[in-house]
């Protein structure tokens, strides 16, 4: 690549970043639009939505060397996907190689060496287990800075008809726009789910006069493993260690090189998405 081409490439990346960080509507967390299937949150839940602007940010994590998981709505209809920032402040181009609309999942191929995170066997996960959400919340306000929050698994998600949705669980770690697609980490450092949705707190408050705080939902690790089957990133479930109790700063350090922001320049907004 000659000097002119390098200059153009740098300019293009900077242009995307400016679109992302200067946009007044850069909100990437939960679409209110979702198909009414057993795999998709009902209208009472917000599914962390892509912005109508030309660029947006979510979170992703490596599950194999060169392969990253994120939420599909983070990257759908994108003409350019970048992963970063790396230690040397670079952004690496990524490509979608598999998607699942119903489960809101996307597998990305990235020319990047990064340690993968292990996916825990969901059958080992007890209700009440401590959990850590790691991602890039509120990028328009806080800049693209990685954050960690702590909570517990509150239980399985119950849909409006009071049936148990076996694919999602409720957790209390604070989750904001930009966390979408990020991992939920157990105290032993393994992934037990992916951040995908949260309760529409303002909508619920208008109906109940009660403001629910930190009611969020994640797709279980068992669904992530099923999605990766028959792909280059296929993996098996690891046994969860309930005796291992890493502290938050240790969790963040352990996963530091595996979790990145996913920057997506949109080709066109999703129809019906706010």
Residue ranges and their predicted role:
Residues 57, 64-143, 165-168, 230-242:
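Conserved active-site neighborhood of the chymotrypsin/trypsin-like protease fold
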Residues 117-167, 175-179, 195-206:
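Flexible, gly/ser-rich surface segments that form the specificity/activation loops bordering the active-site cleft
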